[in-house]
């Protein structure tokens, strides 16, 4: 369910703005998207796991708030990020 340290480092390198950037909004959204995708795969086989489903909803809400922040501050960065992550626009 969780992502490996190697996968997390790869995401950080891919979405980082500078070399030592590990906490920017884009990096956080990428890591949250990876965790959300892993949980979505988990629910295909464990559809009665309601505790993890609540965790999924919390992660989706956190990602939505981060994306709203990015959209408010830099629309072009927001559009680039959602296209790279493969997610839909926020209304």
UniProtKB/Swiss-Prot annotation:
**Which GO molecular function, any one, fits this protein according to its record?**
rRNA binding
Q: Does the keyword Oxidoreductase apply?
A: no
Biological process annotations from GO: translation
Annotated keywords? Ribonucleoprotein, Ribosomal protein, RNA-binding, rRNA-binding
Pfam families for this protein: Ribosomal_S15
| One Gene Ontology CC term in the entry | cytosolic small ribosomal subunit
Family per similarity comment: Belongs to the universal ribosomal protein uS15 family.
Oligomeric state and interaction partners are given as:
Part of the 30S ribosomal subunit. Forms a bridge to the 50S subunit in the 70S ribosome, contacting the 23S rRNA.
Quote the protein name from its UniProt record. Answer: Small ribosomal subunit protein uS15
UniProt source species? Rickettsia felis (strain ATCC VR-1525 / URRWXCal2) (Rickettsia azadi)
In the UniProt record, the gene name given for this protein reads: rpsO
């Amino acid at each position: 369910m969780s992502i490996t340290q190697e996968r997390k480092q790869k995401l950080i390198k891919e979405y980082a703005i500078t070399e030592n950037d590990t906490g920017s909004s884009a990096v956080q959204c990428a890591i949250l998207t990876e965790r959300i995708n892993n949980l979505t795969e988990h629910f295909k086989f464990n559809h009665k796991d309601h505790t993890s489903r609540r965790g999924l909803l919390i992660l989706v809400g956190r990602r939505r708030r981060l994306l709203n922040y990015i959209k408010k501050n830099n629309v072009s960065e927001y559009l680039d990020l959602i296209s790279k992550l493969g997610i839909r626009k926020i209304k």
